[in-house]
Curated annotation (Swiss-Prot):
Name the UniProt record assigns to this protein: GTPase Obg
Pfam family, one: MMR_HSR1
EC number(s) from the headed UniProt entry: 3.6.5.-
Organism of this sequence: Bartonella henselae (strain ATCC 49882 / DSM 28221 / CCUG 30454 / Houston 1) (Rochalimaea henselae)
Keyword tRNA-binding: no
Residues in OBG-type G domain copies: 160-327
Annotated Mg(2+) binding sites: 173, 193
Length: 340
């Protein structure tokens, strides 16, 4: 399935149905009086979070959505039928914005959650409503009110416990494929990953969702390369696996490029908990990898792990470190919810 994380849609709720002009007609009753019913309310436009979706690709092919008009009122004081609603099915993690693409309307984070984006117009009054002491047989009814019309942006921010970040060819896709059932494209050239991949990692009876974020390069936050488009997916992650290829000549520079991009992007990405790991260590001697690890630790002041997705050396320890941080974050969320 193709990946699309942003889409523009045009929606319109249904117009209300018109009220009826009708008079009671029964045998032996000469002046039955008005009995025109009200029009039905127009259909609403809803956004609904459904399971099994992880892309907005459907909205590339259909952008216009219009709910049905309410039914017209009828005689015998019968109200018109409500117009059918339109439901926009979206993945977990979808945010909906106004036409300016900056004003947030709603953030949909749970399956089954729904939000009314446009309310249908009210139905018009039938002539029964216009009876007065001086006009017992009004020939007047209201048309229904118009529905709402809006232009909206849908933006998907994948919900993953952990994000995998790093420069192109840092081994992110290989890491994801080695610890989950995901099958991202893996090749020896930059930007192999053109959109995020999700997978579920399991370690010691614990599991968490991993997202492989396409490679960042210097200037990504300004639109260079493809990384800036997907930095938003990092926002929801509890921890970041920051991978640096052990084959890099300057591992510190490789680390700092990505850190600078996170900081420049904003939205507190730079404050995310990270696990730094040298990848592809199977390509170096023990002395070479150790030297790069110690140098990186000295400059950053942080612990640096090492692993190889090919030989699986250090892989389980890396997963355990991530699972522990995620577990602690989940417990904090539970406590926070109980306090609220």
């Amino acid at each position: 399935m193709k990946f699309l994380d942003q889409a523009k849609v045009y929606i319109r709720s249904g117009n209300g149905g018109a009220g009826a002009i009708s008079f009671r007609r029964e045998k032996f009753i000469e002046f039955g009086g008005p009995d025109g019913g009200d029009g039905g309310r127009g259909g609403d436009v809803w956004a609904l979070v459904v399971d099994g979706l992880n892309t907005l690709i459907d909205y590339r092919y259909q952008q216009h959505f219009r709910a049905k008009t309410g039914g017209h009122g009828k005689g015998r004081n019968m109200t018109g039928q409500k117009g059918d609603d339109i439901i926009l099915k979206v993945p977990v993690g979808t945010q909906i914005f106004e036409e300016d693409n900056t004003t947030l309307i709603c953030d949909l984070t749970e399956v089954g959650q729904r939000y009314r984006l446009a309310k249908g117009g009210n139905g018009g009054f039938g002539n029964l409503h216009f009876t007065t002491s001086t006009n017992r047989a009004p020939r007047r009814a209201n048309p229904g009110l118009s529905g709402e019309e809006r232009t909206l942006w849908l933006r998907l921010k994948l919900i993953a416990d952990a994000g995998i970040i790093g420069l192109p060819n840092a081994g992110k896709s290989t890491f994801l494929a080695s610890v989950t059932a995901a099958k991202p494209k893996v090749a020896d050239y930059p930007f192999t990953t053109l959109y995020p991949h999700l997978g579920v990692a399991r370690i010691d009876a614990r599991e968490f969702v991993l997202a492989d974020i396409p490679g960042l390069i210097e200037g990504a936050h300004e639109g260079v390369g493809i990384g800036d488009r997907f930095l938003g997916h990092v926002e929801r992650c509890r921890v970041l696996f920051h991978l640096i290829s052990a084959q890099e000549e300057d591992v510190v520079k490789a680390y700092q490029i990505v850190r600078n991009e996170l900081k420049a992007y904003g939205n507190n990405l730079n404050d995310k908990t990270e696990i730094i790991a040298l990848s592809q260590i199977d390509t170096l001697t023990i002395e070479e990898r150790k030297a790069k690890q110690e140098f990186l630790q000295k400059v950053t002041g942080k612990s640096v792990m090492m692993f190889s997705a090919v030989s699986r050396e250090g892989l389980e320890n890396l997963l355990r470190a991530g699972a522990h941080i995620i577990e602690m974050a989940r417990k904090k969320d539970v406590v926070r919810e109980e306090q609220d």
